[in-house]
Amino acid sequence: MAKMKHGSAQFRPDHLGTQPRKSDANKGKKMNTKGNENPQYIPPKG
């Protein structure tokens, strides 16, 4: 079991910054990191 855990650590490390696959699958994170794109909905003023 210990070997398996160590092997999976290479593919999925504890650091969030080194998990591009996880953030890709996480739609919530995608929506949260929409800083570069323009907002789809702009509330009317007034």
From Swiss-Prot:
What Pfam family is a match, any one? Answer: SspN
Residue segments, region Disordered: 1-46
Its Gene Ontology cellular component terms are: endospore-forming forespore
- InterPro entries per record: SASP_SspN (IPR012612)
- List the keywords (alphabetical): Sporulation
What GO biological process term is on the record, naming one?
sporulation resulting in formation of a cellular spore
Induction, as annotated: Expressed only in the forespore compartment of sporulating cells.
Q: Give the protein family.
A: Belongs to the SspN family.
Name of the protein: Small, acid-soluble spore protein N
Species name for this entry?
Answer: Halalkalibacterium halodurans (strain ATCC BAA-125 / DSM 18197 / FERM 7344 / JCM 9153 / C-125)
What gene does the UniProt entry assign to this protein? sspN
